[in-house]
Amino acid sequence: MMRLDQSMFWFAHYRYSWLFLILVLTASVNVSAEIIHHELQVKLYPQQSRMSVIDDMQLPAETDSADFTLRSSFTVVAPGVELIVRGQSADGRLRHYQINRLPADGKVQLLYEGNILSDSVQGPFGMPDSVLDGDTVYLGGGSYWVPRIEDFPRCRFRMIVSAPLDWEIISQGMRSVQDDAVIFDMAHPQEEIYLVGGPYKRFAQTHDSVELEVYLYEGDTELATSYLQASANYISLYSDWIGAYPYTRFAVVENRWQTGYGMPSFTLLGSRVIRLPFIPDTSLPHEILHNWWGNGVYIDFSKGNWSEGLTAYMSDHYSNEQQGKDAEYRRKALERYVNFAAEGRDFALADFSSRHDEASQAVGYSKSLMLFHMLRRFGGDELFNQGIRHFWQQYQFRPADFPDVIKALFPGADAEYKAYIEQWLYRTGAPEIALGEVTVSKINNDYVLSVEIRQQQKGPAYTLRIPLEVSLEGNQQPVREQVDLSAKRKVHTYRYNQRPRAIRLDPEYDVFRLLDPLERPASLGRLFGAKQQVLVMPQGASKDQRKAWRELAAAWTGLYKNVRLVDSNDMNGLPEDAAVWLLGWQNELLERFQQRLTSSTQQLSARAVTINNQRLAADRHTVVLLDPDNSRAPLAFIGADDPVAILMMARKLPHYSSYGVLAFDTHQQENI
């Protein structure tokens, strides 16, 4: 199954849209225990965008008939059996067939050939879902280049590929070369078969019996070595943590489209993405881990996609934990939920299939990883890690649903487990916890602390285990307590030898909950996630500037669906129920609201800003300032005059949603 990298850009997983298409076309998928086998002979003719395939399929013996789907550009022949065309998809891309009168041994041969045009369905990076031209071949499950048989969704395969001599071919399975052909043998059940290739330079080394590869368009040995070493390190890490790496190979493959895709045993990274210095220690481990979660244990989507949250927790959260930054990572996860999914915009975690907008990301990633963090805290590291290994041993190359993975990690009794999944998988919303009345009294030589804790969300109480931190006079380190709360209000008492002087509830953000406004510093995400974003364009903007601001508004409308662009002369004041962006240095409203954009660390003047005592002039810098007061409706200023810089803001700012102030070198387009 294809994955999109989330650790850098939080990309949308359009592989799942293919899955939904399959489900619609086949009406119902019988998740059969039977695994079919494809013996594929593939010839590629890239200059003609053409391919031919011989597929010797082994179906279960005594199979009378089978329905399958293939792309409509292929001409298909099925010697010795009856082949019937049943129809095609609404867009004409796919054709549905039935084969009848199958031999008793279940062996069927299909011969097909045709063109692969690159003007088909586009992914989120502008990359077609099927490509075969003089530079690239990319074929996956959504390409329907291998018959999709509705009764047998998983397969093993052996594939022999003939391609131009200067091409390298990548797929799943053990790789070998015979004469001018490349052979792939995949013994483990797969949900789809990939065929990727082009005029690559191949770099390889072996690590603990796993063949590591890097495929680049140019012979950049230093870049290849960095990815080979990082791949070895992370495969060792996760193998020790979970169980042996499930494939014989792992490859990092350069792509001419700027993708961040992850497939079984390889990842497809854009030519610019692959050269970003942080990718080997952020995106790469995320994609490697997906070979266990999602491409090693498959996802039963009927009760939600657990893979994204578990992968984010064991890769991105783990990396931050190693650097002592895990509490802030969790705070940002909770902040994302509040910004984009709170106030009735979320849905049950059991209904999450893939990320398609900010709200689905906040549920399927942020809420999900917090669930796994709470499970780990509930039972402790040892039980959590034992559960992870047991889950892997039980379900590898089989589908598992969300309750399955929770059950493997849950340390309590069955009744508690059922209540847990009901609370976190099927309920929408989040707990809202707060301190109530707090008193300290002295009894004999002890101090008795009485703490009221409330759940303020609408609806019934959650069952929670909440950390409580108590600072005592004379103690440098606070005392850590655990509060078990299953009512909307409860009073807890504690006895100490020293006087309590301060308390903090969930100080390290260990509980999935709504953040208090004081825990949410000003950030771009608060504007992006508002019910409405009002973008105020300066009346005096030039034609080119106005065009650029309109393109920014259009791009953000596509992302957030809540954008309204207005002229400054149409604004008598700022709305109290919307986030407002003041656009451009010459904005007529800027002077009027200048004070709201000024604080002890940022000062705004006519053609410059000062951030942490560093003056940034408008002619050389593009800046973003926010009103730091979260008690008011969000207000932001984008200081940009150059149309190129404005379009840079359109692209870059959505990736900085946790930031509260930004400055860029306008000409270099780099963050300062």
PLM features: residue spans?
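Amphipathic alpha-helical substructures
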Residues: Q361-V451
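A surface-exposed beta-strand-loop module
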Residues: R71-P128, A487-R499
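Zinc-dependent metallopeptidase catalytic helix centered on the HExxH motif
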Residues: L268-R330, I388, F402
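Acidic/His/Gly-enriched intrinsically disordered linker/tail segments
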Residues: F278, S302, E308-M374, F378, ...
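Beta-strand-rich binding/interaction modules
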Residues: V76-G80, Y417-K418, P431-D506
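Hydrophobic helix-coil surface modules that form long, contiguous segments used
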Residues: V53, R148-P285, Y313-D316
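Solvent-exposed alpha-helical segments and adjacent loops
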Residues: P521-I672
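Glycine/proline-rich low-complexity spacer/linker segments in large multi-domain proteins
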Residues: Y112-F157, V511-Q532
